[in-house]
């Protein structure tokens, strides 16, 4: 019998066997499809699969809980929030991706360029005070977010938590304002990236570079979350190298080891003073510091696509300390020592030429490094643009799934891409071509004013959700022992953060209405450019209340569902692993215990 005849006989016998008629489908033998066809098919709806039994996903919760019987009837919130057969996000982010997103994913123009304006307005001491105190608030907020995300690693994170723990109208207002912010940030960052190129060559039309960067960012996000994670990981590595390199260079320059051999020390603190423009200058710096840390909450959005959130997220949350200390506090300490607050370069320059990091290197007499650091700024800007598409698309998909937006936005294809949000981001990204318009700055300022306070309200929302989560646990007689990760700063860290953010909003109101140099005269245009976001959030909130006719301010503590949304895991097993890990750590030297906790 020939080989061909044997193959035909084997196939025929398989098809005619009793087992094949019951266990094999006609689709077992398929015709290979091209890569292009596979790519096109990936945008189709996912194959229909029956939802898993709800009891299996929750039976591992502690039977000692007074709500154990209720738990058995609940199911994962990711499925309850997802319209039938709309697909779900893929958990393809690895531990290395999450660590890098947490460590430097939000570092961009706010720190690398915007800190120059803050130095001029407030002085070097104001930089340390504002970023130091703001850093404590962000530290508390991210730990609060971490506690919620480890317990409920669902898409939308804080917008979903607002719906669960506060009120649907509040979730609608905060969620859409946050999404709109990222919609506007994308074209802004693309234009900023093109401006970075003009540092080397200003003869080429910036619109050409804008088009290249636009296609690059859209393609990265179209290929899926794994490619987004890889891109962010490598871009963050470049940021870390750049900032650490600048700090080392700063030590050398301050001590007189630069080409000029001039000992700088605290020269500019004595010469120009530690503060500029008095109390209002310091107050204005607080506002800038808050905006420079926008995006710190991105690790929460990523929790829905992390392969192992119970292990990866706690470690990523602890990395926030190093980002605040290394990226912000240490680097700005040397900025205050190396750049005078009244430097003409801070006033007359634009784009990356106004970056205090570039100015510090130039003042040190090093003429090759500014170009290298400008390249790092370019990569940081592209990183923020990449994160803008990611953050916007996931938030919009979550809002659609919760019924807080058009249902079409809830669609997730076979590859786990939220296509509605991606398409919307790509459409708004086309605003980047306004760079060819002579007055694009004015247009972008007014566009950004619509969601200018989104970050502050989102942070406030995280603190509020965490407080109400803890209150609901207490009200329903639940224990913190149910949680595998708790915020280091506890519930009082959230309370402190909420109070701090309210103070920042008051300061923002004052400095927006009476900006520096106004001589006590109100400036209406400046006020609306900086405070219009508060009005927009109020309109969204009241509008949703009127539309739904739901007049309750918030969900009652006893009615908050503390079980739906828990991941399918063996809680007792995880507790045992945690205790075993703690016991192993106790046997290690102190320095190793500290390293394992903070790194």
Curated annotation (Swiss-Prot):
Biased composition (Polar residues): 12-25
Composition bias type Low complexity, residue spans: 51-65
Segments for region (Disordered): 1-80
Induction context: Expression is under control of the CSY1 amino-acid sensor. Expression is also regulated by PLC1 and GCN4. Expression is induced during development of biofilm.
Transmembrane domains' residue ranges: 100-120, 122-142, 146-166, 180-200, 204-224, 235-255, 320-340, 364-384, 418-438, 443-463, 487-507, 527-547
GO MF annotations, alphabetized: amino acid transmembrane transporter activity
Pfam short name (any one): AA_permease
Domain of life where this protein originates: Eukaryota
Principal location: membrane
Gene name of this polypeptide: HIP1
Family: Belongs to the amino acid-polyamine-organocation (APC) superfamily. YAT (TC 2.A.3.10) family.
Family matches, as InterPro entries: AA-permease/SLC12A_dom, Amino_acid_permease_CS, Amino_acid_permease_fungi, APC_YAT
Membrane-related topology note: Multi-pass membrane protein
Any one GO biological process: amino acid transmembrane transport
Keywords, in A-Z order: Amino-acid transport, Cell membrane, Membrane, Transmembrane, Transmembrane helix, Transport
Record's function text: Amino-acid permease that is able to transport phenylalanine.
PANTHER family the record matches: AMINO ACID PERMEASE (PTHR43341), GENERAL AMINO-ACID PERMEASE GAP1 (PTHR43341:SF1)
Name assigned to this protein: Amino-acid permease GAP3
Localization: Cell membrane
Origin organism lineage: Eukaryota, Fungi, Dikarya, Ascomycota, Saccharomycotina
GO cellular component terms, A-Z: membrane; plasma membrane
